[in-house]
C-alpha cells in the first residue's frame, strides 16, 4: 500500500470508531455520564451492572456509571449501580481490584468466582472426546470460556435486578479486536466507545483515579500458561502507537501494517451475526 492508501484507510477507521479529532476531558466526562443516565432512564430499567477487574477501563466505566445513577437519583429516578468482582479463583492482582472498587464507590458489590463453572465446562469438553491440538490452544480456549462465564454472571444479576450490562470496550480495543466475542465484548452499552487508551486514562485521572489505576499495565489475564501477559505483548505494538493511529497521527509502516492486520482479522467481532442477506452476491 502507498502512503496515501494508508492515510485513507486510517481516516475511514477513525470515522468508523467515532474517535473525535479534539478532546476536552471535562466536557467528555459530562457527556458520557449524561448519556448513561439518559440511556438507563429511557429503557425503563433501574440498574447498571459491570465487572470490575482492577484495570483502568473497568474502573473508569464503573465510576462513570456510579455518577450516572447518582445523577438519576438526584432527579427522582430510582437507579443503582452494581459492581461485580469476577475472579477466576484467586486473582493475581486482587489488590488492584480492591483499589478500583474503592475508587468506583458502587452502590452494591457482588463477588462471583467463575473458576468452578469455567473449569467444569473445560472438563466436559475433554470428557466428550474433544482433543486440543496443544496445551497452549487448550489454555487459550479455556481463557475465552472464563470471559464468557463472567458475562453470564453479569447478565444473571442484570436479569434479576432490572439491569443493563456495561461493557468496557474503547476505540483501541475495538481497533485491535482485543476482546472475547460474546465474552467481555457482549454488553448492552459501551460508555468508553470512541476513546483511545490515553484518553481513557485521562478520564480516569480527571475522575480522581489513583495513578496505580490510571497507569496499570493492561492485561486480559485469561491464560494460565502466561499469567498477567500484557496486551501489548499480544499486539506487537504499543498502546501509544495504537492511539497515535486513532488520533490521526503518522505512524511507521510497520505499525500501519500491524494495526490493519488486526483490524481486518477481527471484523467479525464488531458485526452482528451474518445472514445470507449480508453476503455479497456476484
Curated annotation (Swiss-Prot):
SUPFAM superfamilies: Adenine nucleotide alpha hydrolases-like. Pathway: Cofactor biosynthesis; NAD(+) biosynthesis; NAD(+) from deamido-NAD(+) (ammonia route): step 1/1. Pfam families: NAD_synthase (PF02540). One of its GO terms (biological process) is NAD biosynthetic process. ATP binds at residues 51-58, 168, 197, 219. Gene3D superfamilies: HUPs. Mg(2+) binds at residues 57, 173. Keywords: ATP-binding, Ligase, Magnesium, Metal-binding, NAD, Nucleotide-binding. Its EC number is 6.3.1.5. InterPro entries: NAD/GMP_synthase (IPR022310), NAD_synthase (IPR003694), NH(3)-dep_NAD(+)_synth (IPR022926), Rossmann-like_a/b/a_fold (IPR014729). One of its GO terms (molecular function) is metal ion binding. It is an enzyme of class 6 (ligase). It catalyses: deamido-NAD(+) + NH4(+) + ATP = AMP + diphosphate + NAD(+) + H(+). Belongs to the NAD synthetase family. Catalyzes the ATP-dependent amidation of deamido-NAD to form NAD. Uses ammonia as a nitrogen source. Homodimer. This is NH(3)-dependent NAD(+) synthetase. It comes from Burkholderia ambifaria (strain MC40-6). The lineage of its organism: Bacteria, Pseudomonadati, Pseudomonadota, Betaproteobacteria, Burkholderiales.
Amino acid at each position: 500500500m502507498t502512503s496515501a492508501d494508508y492515510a485513507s484507510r486510517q481516516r475511514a477507521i477513525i470515522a468508523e470508531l467515532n474517535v473525535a479529532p479534539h478532546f476536552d476531558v471535562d466536557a467528555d466526562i459530562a457527556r458520557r455520564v449524561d448519556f448513561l443516565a439518559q440511556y438507563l432512564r429511557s429503557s425503563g430499567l433501574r440498574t447498571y451492572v459491570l465487572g470490575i477487574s482492577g484495570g483502568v477501563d473497568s474502573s473508569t466505566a464503573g465510576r462513570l456509571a456510579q455518577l450516572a445513577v447518582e445523577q438519576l437519583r438526584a432527579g427522582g429516578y430510582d437507579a443503582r449501580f452494581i459492581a461485580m468482582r469476577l475472579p477466576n479463583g484467586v486473582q493475581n492482582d486482587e489488590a488492584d481490584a480492591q483499589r478500583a472498587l474503592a475508587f468506583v464507590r458502587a452502590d452494591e458489590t457482588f463477588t462471583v468466582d467463575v473458576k468452578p463453572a469455567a473449569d467444569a465446562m473445560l472438563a466436559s469438553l475433554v470428557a466428550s472426546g474433544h482433543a486440543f491440538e496443544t496445551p497452549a490452544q487448550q489454555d487459550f480456549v479455556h481463557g475465552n470460556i472464563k470471559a464468557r462465564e463472567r458475562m453470564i454472571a453479569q447478565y444473571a444479576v442484570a436479569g434479576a435486578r432490572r439491569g443493563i450490562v456495561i461493557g468496557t470496550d474503547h476505540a483501541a480495543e475495538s481497533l485491535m479486536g482485543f476482546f472475547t466475542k460474546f465474552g467481555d465484548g457482549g454488553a448492552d452499552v459501551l460508555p468508553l466507545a470512541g476513546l483511545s487508551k490515553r484518553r481513557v486514562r485521562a478520564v480516569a485521572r480527571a475522575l480522581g483515579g489513583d495513578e496505580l489505576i490510571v497507569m496499570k499495565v493492561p492485561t486480559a489475564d485469561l491464560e494460565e500458561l502466561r499469567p498477567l501477559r500484557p496486551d501489548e505483548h499480544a499486539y506487537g505494538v504499543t498502546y501509544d502507537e495504537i492511539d497515535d493511529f486513532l488520533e490521526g497521527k503518522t505512524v511507521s509502516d510497520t505499525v500501519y501494517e500491524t494495526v490493519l492486520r488486526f483490524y481486518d482479522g477481527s471484523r467479525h467481532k464488531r458485526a452482528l451475526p451474518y445472514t445470507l442477506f449480508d453476503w455479497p452476491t456476484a
